[in-house]
């Protein structure tokens, strides 16, 4: 009889422990260890004239060795030649192929302002590298149209949301 009472009490104790443990994990918030990017893309730009520019402007995230990125840059350049009121363009490159930046601009008429940031920097708690800003949500090339500080259109990758110069022209000159 005592053995059954101990077994019964032990079973109740185990059930209570499991219920409390489950309730604890369900009700207490779990802190994510991943870095969260709450900043706007434009906040990573280190060009005051671009940041302070009123009106439309275009921010690009490119890799210097990326063929799709170079094609997007050439398309932007061609579109800019068609209209004098084309927005200013600022490019952020990753440092993985920094030595290819001069040849990236071969065949491009305009001189675009650009900056280079580290490809990856997981040693800090800050979001301060190309991968942390763009990955995993966005693929190269990333082209973003702003009106002042308000994002109007974001193109990225090479699939459904890829950069489309005709779509950009329609938005700019409608």
Report residues per predicted region.
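Thiol-/selenol-based redox modules, centered on thioredoxin-like
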Residues: 11-13, 25-26, 81-84, 151-174
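Alpha-helical transmembrane signal-anchor/signal-peptide segments
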Residues: 32-46
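Short active-site neighborhood of thiol/selenol oxidoreductases, capturing the structured segment around
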Residues: 49-70, 75-76, 88, 92
């Amino acid at each position: 009889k005592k053995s059954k009472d101990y077994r019964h009490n032990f079973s109740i104790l185990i059930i209570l422990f499991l219920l409390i443990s489950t309730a604890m994990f369900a009700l207490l918030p779990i802190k994510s260890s991943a870095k969260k990017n709450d900043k706007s893309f434009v906040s990573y730009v280190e060009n005051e004239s671009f940041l302070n520019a009123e009106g439309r402007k275009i921010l690009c995230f490119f890799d210097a060795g990326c063929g799709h990125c170079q094609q997007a840059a050439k398309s932007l350049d061609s579109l800019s030649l068609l209209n004098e009121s084309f927005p200013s363009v600022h490019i952020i490159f990753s440092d993985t192929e920094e030595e290819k930046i001069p040849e990236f601009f071969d065949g491009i008429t305009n001189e675009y302002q650009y900056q280079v940031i580290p490809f990856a920097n997981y040693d800090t708690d800050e979001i301060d590298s190309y991968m942390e800003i763009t990955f995993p949500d966005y693929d190269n090339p990333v082209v973003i149209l702003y009106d002042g500080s308000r994002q109007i259109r974001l193109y990225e990758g090479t699939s459904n949301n890829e950069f489309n110069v005709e779509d950009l022209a329609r938005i700019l000159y409608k």
